[in-house]
Structure formats: structure tokens, C-alpha cells
Amino acid sequence: MKFRVIYQHTSPSAHSPARVVEQNTGREIGWINRYLDREYVRRLGDKTLRIYAYNLLHFVRWWASIHHTGEVRETDLTESTLREYLCFQSSLQPRPSGSTINDRIAIADRALRNEFPDAP
């Protein structure tokens, strides 16, 4: 599975212009785009939304490499999910900066909590 960020210069009023989709099918990744829409309604800037989309794109690529899907179910989340993502990022070469790793984890945490408020 391959994922990418698309940017729509004209989007419906309550939809973020930055969207994460599966590359081959164009199918949107629902949990990510719902979070981006929520942040868009909060009036975050387009550049900020695009950064969020790319950070979540990185997470969903990692998630799909393990779970073979971009969809996240609450039952798949564990207390160690974000720690495992942290370890994955720390093992990359070249290693991302500490602030990049922290930004990616923070946005993934917020998006997952938005979708699954009762998850571990």
C-alpha cells in the first residue's frame, strides 16, 4: 500500500484542503482526514494542515507496514503503539531530529485520541 498527501486548492467549506489518500485507489484515509477537517474548522492555517498531513502520512506508512492497512481500529491500539513508532523513527538512517520525532508522535497521538478517545 502506498499513501500520499494531496492538496485541493478549492475544498468544501468544512474540509481541509490537505488530504491523505491511498495512492493507487485514491481512497481517503478516514481517521486522518476527519482529524484534519476538525483542525481546519478550528481555523488552522493551510501550511499547518499540510505539515500535519505529512506527519500523519509518515505514521500511516509505518502503521500499514505492520498491519497491512491504513485503517486503525481501537482494538489494534495498545499502550505501546506510540513507543513502537518512536523506536521505529529512532532506527531510521539518517535519523530524524528529536523535534521531528516529537512532532510526529504528538500529532499522531492527537489524531488517534480524536478518533478513539477511550483507547489506551
Name the predicted role of every residue range.
Residues 1-61, 65:
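Basic/aromatic DNA-contact patch characteristic of tyrosine site-specific recombinases
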Residues 33-47, 56-120:
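N-terminal core-binding DNA-recognition domain of tyrosine recombinases/integrases
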